């Protein structure tokens, strides 16, 4: 089997359920999407190919539209990014979740129903109620700050720092608090290569000044 064949069968086995939940299957997004004026959700599956074996996993991509539009301008980008990507392992409370997402091995058509069921069950148990929570800017901000506090490399980088500053600006935090975070984030990037460091420093300064 090829990945496109597996994806088509997963769609066949799950589309009716997700349609009822307000999602639309989008092939290029690897799964199901839901869009409002405030956010864009992509809940679906990513895979690694070791033909004839494929390893599938479940992932939730969360894009807060206003945050990402500002970040796009700040970095002079081309496409909107994701405010954060949640792997199923996060919801399962797995230690070092960022690198330990559960995997479903698919080699034959008979392996697919178990993954399709997991996609539905995980949504019902974890993701459905999480979406209205995490798409609130204040909750996303608190989540990102918690992740930064863990010291994890995945959360201590310019992408997360700049999004935190954007959220603080949008939520009208006192400028003193924002500047305190700015100083903290700049110190965390102090070891970066000089040219990159100056780019990120300028981007963060522009966010704090509202230059977008």
Annotated model-derived regions:
Residues 3-26:
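Amphipathic alpha-helical segments
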């Amino acid at each position: 089997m090829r990945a496109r064949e597996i994806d088509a069968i997963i769609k066949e086995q799950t589309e009716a359920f997700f349609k009822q939940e307000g999602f639309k299957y989008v092939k290029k997004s690897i799964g199901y999407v839901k869009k409002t004026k405030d956010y864009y959700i992509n809940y679906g599956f990513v895979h690694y190919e070791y033909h004839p074996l494929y390893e599938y996993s479940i992932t939730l991509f969360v894009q807060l539209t206003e945050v990402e539009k500002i970040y796009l301008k700040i970095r002079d980008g081309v496409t909107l990014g994701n405010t954060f990507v949640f792997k199923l392992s996060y919801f399962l409370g797995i230690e070092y979740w960022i690198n330990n997402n559960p995997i479903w091995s698919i080699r034959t058509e008979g392996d697919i129903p178990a993954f399709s069921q997991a996609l539905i069950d995980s949504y019902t148990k974890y993701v459905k109620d999480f979406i209205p929570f995490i798409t609130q800017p204040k909750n996303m901000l608190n989540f990102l700050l918690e992740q930064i506090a863990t010291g994890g490399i995945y959360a201590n980088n310019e992408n997360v720092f700049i999004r935190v500053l954007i959220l603080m600006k949008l939520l009208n935090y006192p400028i003193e608090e924002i500047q305190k975070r700015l100083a903290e984030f700049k110190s965390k990037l102090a070891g970066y290569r000089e040219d990159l460091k100056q780019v990120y420093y300028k981007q963060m300064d522009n966010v704090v000044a509202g230059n977008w």
